Amino acid sequence: MMFDTAFDLLMTHEGNYSDHKADPGGKTRFGVTEAVAREVGYRGDMRELPLDLARRIYLERYWNPVRASELPVRVRYAVFDAAVNSGVGQSAKWLQRAAGVTADGVIGPRTLAAANAANPDALLCRLLAQRLRFMADLPTWPAFGRGWARRITSLMEG
């Protein structure tokens, strides 16, 4: 899976515009928070955030920093999706723990080597188990937990 396919899949989960009162991200469009949109220079109404800008944000701020293109195909999307929901550093730490290397939150040569040497299905299971445990402990779990659990478990099927 390469970025364009991952982005298209991500859009099936992130939807269009949202301003859910329980979401600490506030206003989002295509899953991009208003804070992130402003950081990259977008000044318009969040309801009008262009899809091509969202695509660029996801490539530059999530896909590339987790070095998804260099990861085993089986875990690429899961690591990218986790970065989108919980941050690049947290996603990297889950991958590192799953691969048995020091969890420093930065995907470098050691992480890539360990991830690529691991059994991809086992690596994915360990990564997703950590993510689900983390999400279940969040105060927003009652509002969003059912959707998060479906999203995370769907990654086992792909």
Per-segment meaning from a language model:
Residues M1-G158:
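Cell-wall polysaccharide-cleaving catalytic domain and substrate-binding groove, primarily
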